[in-house]
Amino acid sequence: MPLDPEVRNFLQVYYKANIIDFTKYQFQEIRQKVNELLAKAVPKDPVGETRDMKIKLEDYELPIRIYSPIKRTNNGLVMHFHGGAWILGSIETEDAISRILSNSCECTVISVDYRLAPEYKFPTAVYDCFNAIVWARDNAGELGIDKDKIATFGISAGGNLVAATSLLARDNKLKLTAQVPVVPFVYLDLASKSMNRYRKGYFLDINLPVDYGVKMYIRDEKDLYNPLFSPLIAEDLSNLPQAIVVTAEYDPLRDQGEAYAYRLMESGVPTLSFRVNGNVHAFLGSPRTSRQVTVMIGALLKDIFK
């Protein structure tokens, strides 16, 4: 279908502003500008309660935010990993999404402020997210959640971390109830139809931020073939948590996300895959669509947690 007029207007304003311009700005300035843009992308809803704390890891204290819904009907938990090409984003940039998700799922949500590249290279972010899941399971009683009802949710690079931690959880015999990778990066694919068609002019440009983000995140080219970076090429995708995979029509990552869903199905993993037409990567420029998609995901997870 045609590009949503609201999204088209957003793209015109976004490219005119030229936020990601390394001839004008230093990286830290770009990080700040993009984070400010993302934080305002969707209006924030009230929730029952939010609580900020830090998880003590072996060498680091990992910030998290715990969201309680206005109305709780189940003791499930959704672990939320934000997007941002592994180099951008924070709890704040997807605070609105966490709030919508908590209220629509009617359960607790924990958003994880994992460490970013280039300060911290792959696989630091993966293990930050995985360790947050382990911490939540170990503290299920205090959190008021069922340790056997934990789902993961993430957008873009967050979707990559969802898929990667699903592999880690399976291999470490840690049960997850569901995985929800939304417009995920699961493989550095430069040859697909969607990658070629939407590689420039649809927000997620291939040179910036995709290629730049990848180069800042990985340690060397060997990481490109590590399943924790490229879950799509993992030899075995069986026995992973059931999946809800969401893609966007005008997104260069669309085809790889749908290929991941197909491989999950082939591997016997119960999988629901749907494409949001008329929208770009992460539904930027359409707060209405972003809200609708998040509410639908929350409703599906609520049903899974029953």
Swiss-Prot record:
Temperature dependence: Optimum temperature is 94 degrees Celsius. Very thermostable, but rapidly inactivated above 94 degrees Celsius. Most of the activity is retained for 5 days at 50 degrees Celsius, and approximately 70% of the activity is retained after 5 days at 70 degrees Celsius. 52% of the activity is still retained after 50 hours at 90 degrees Celsius, but completely inactivated after 5 days at 90 degrees Celsius.
UniProt keyword annotation of Iron-sulfur present: no
Motif Involved in the stabilization of the negatively charged intermediate by the formation of the oxyanion hole location, chain numbering: 82-84
Active site: S156, D251, H281
Keyword Hydrolase appears in the UniProt entry: yes
Highest taxon in the source lineage: Archaea
Similarity comment text for this entry: Belongs to the 'GDXG' lipolytic enzyme family.
Role this protein plays: Has a broad substrate specificity. Hydrolyzes various p-nitrophenyl phosphates, aromatic esters and p-nitrophenyl fatty acids in vitro. Most active against paraoxon, phenyl acetate and p-nitrophenyl caproate (C6), respectively. Also has tributyrinase activity, but shows no hydrolytic activity toward other triacylglycerols including tricaprylin, trimyristin, tripalmitin or triolein in vitro.
Protein's name in the database: Arylesterase
